[in-house]
Regions:
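Catalytic alpha/beta core domains of metabolic enzymes, predominantly
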Residues: 111-112, 125-232
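Active-site beta->alpha loop and helix N-cap motifs at the rims of alpha/beta catalytic domains
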Residues: 1-127, 137
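C-terminal alpha-helical cap/extension of soluble enzyme domains
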Residues: 17, 21-23, 32, 184-187, ...
Length: 280
């Protein structure tokens, strides 16, 4: 954001920074993209701008989740028109539906598109989890519902997803601090906050783990683990936007209310980490 408006120059610069690394894809208008405070019009415009900036070099997955099924379907359809290659759909928040309600909710979204859908289970934000049973039922009925972003805080849950869904279903870590434990249990990668800044280290770590070179992956993981934790000292994306500005990648760290700017204490913690890791 810049003076209350979407900072499209910063968005283009951030996408360019990502494309310099060997990333596999971009997520637009997720939590880190401040989707909760975007209007529907802005939501679609940001997706369209991300697709244009990516230039077909990597797929763009658009966040289209909502706690209203009709709204999620509408967002998904509009995101597809805007050029998204797939959709990240978070569990409905606040109204806390039953597991059967979740199945019907995701089913209606799946029936609105043939493009890949990534389910997003994050109980700490939504108050509910997407059960293994619901995930398996959706995958059986709708093969394009083929990926899970798991921010469960539990390696046990990831293990259950991997065991139940098989090798063709992609389970992705949704927590930078748990990337390596999740991948050791069978996750295939990460949808990352830290990689907004640390593109090359994250790509190299994930690739090493996929190659079963856990010694190399662990070295990177342990080096950057304090950063993975520090960027969640305050609500995401406030700390990572500060980090990106300090690194000269974006010009504005501004966020919209009810998010507020970084406290001085967290700035000092991040500044010390930048110096320690050689990021500035």
């Amino acid at each position: 954001m810049n003076q209350g408006a979407v900072a499209y120059d910063d968005l283009e610069a951030l996408v360019a920074h990502q494309l310099k690394g060997n990333i596999n894809g971009l997520v637009s208008v997720g939590t880190t993209g401040e989707s909760p405070t975007l209007s529907h019009k802005e939501h679609v415009e940001v997706i369209r701008a991300t697709v244009a900036a990516a230039g077909g070099k990597v797929p763009v997955i658009a966040g289209t989740g909502s706690n209203s099924t009709d709204e999620a379907v509408d967002l998904t359809k509009n995101a597809e028109v805007a050029g998204a290659d797939g959709f990240l759909v978070v569990a409905p928040y606040y109204n806390k539906p039953s597991q059967e309600g979740l199945f019907q909710h995701f089913s209606q979204i799946a029936e609105s598109t043939e493009k890949p859908i990534v389910l997003y289970s994050i109980p700490s934000r939504c108050g509910i989890e997407i059960s293994v049973d619901v995930t398996a039922r959706l995958y059986e009925k709708y093969p394009h519902v083929c990926c899970m972003k798991a921010a469960e805080g539990s390696c046990e849950k990831v293990t259950e997803y991997v065991r139940a869904l098989g090798p063709d279903y992609a389970v992705m870590s949704g927590d930078d601090g748990l990337i390596l434990p999740f991948m050791s249990a069978g996750a295939t990668g990460v949808i990352s906050v830290a990689s907004n800044l640390l593109v090359d280290p994250l790509v190299q770590m994930v690739q090493a783990a996929k190659n079963n070179d856990y010694a190399t992956a662990r070295e990177t993981y342990l080096k950057y683990y304090p950063f993975f934790k520090a960027i969640f000292l305050e609500p995401n994306p406030v700390p990572i936007k500060y980090a990106l500005k300090q690194a000269g990648i974006i010009q504005s760290e501004e966020v919209r209310l009810p998010l507020s700017g970084l406290t001085d204490g967290t700035r000092r913690v991040l500044d010390a980490l930048f110096a320690e890791l050689g990021l500035i």
